[in-house]
Amino acid sequence: MIIKRSRKELRRIRHLRIRKKITGTPERPRLAVYKSLRYIYAQIIDDTKGHTLVAASSLEKELRSQLKSTKNIEAAKLVGEVIAKRALEKGIKRVVFDRGGFLYHGKVKALADSARAAGLEF
């Protein structure tokens, strides 16, 4: 019997396939992106230690006050700028981008472009 896999399960499989190839190091940590139906999250992770070095999301109170909606492209752009600013303050300039199994389009692309514009290299 053939059972169709859910979109969420297919995204997880794509993410595992990507994670086989992408790892974050102390010199070049991983910029991981996750989006839910309501918010968008970004974190910079050192995979050798398993530590999150920097994080930002549209769930944060200071970002929500600046946004009309927490789930649109404008929110993703703001999260990208904030994550880049916080990373540069910690001395992180180069990262590896992990799209988290999501298509590189729309919100994910907007976050990546704004992080690049704010000074992160990837």
From Swiss-Prot:
CDD domains xrefs: Ribosomal_L18_L5e
Key words, A-Z: Ribonucleoprotein, Ribosomal protein, RNA-binding, rRNA-binding
Record has Ribonucleoprotein as a keyword: yes
Membrane in keyword set: no
Pfam family, one: Ribosomal_L18p
Biological process terms in GO annotation: translation
Domain of life: Bacteria
An annotated GO cellular component: cytosolic large ribosomal subunit
One MF term in the entry's GO annotations: structural constituent of ribosome
Family: Belongs to the universal ribosomal protein uL18 family.
Role noted for this protein: This is one of the proteins that bind and probably mediate the attachment of the 5S RNA into the large ribosomal subunit, where it forms part of the central protuberance.
Assembly and oligomerization: Part of the 50S ribosomal subunit; part of the 5S rRNA/L5/L18/L25 subcomplex. Contacts the 5S and 23S rRNAs.
Stated name of the protein: Large ribosomal subunit protein uL18
Gene that encodes the chain: rplR
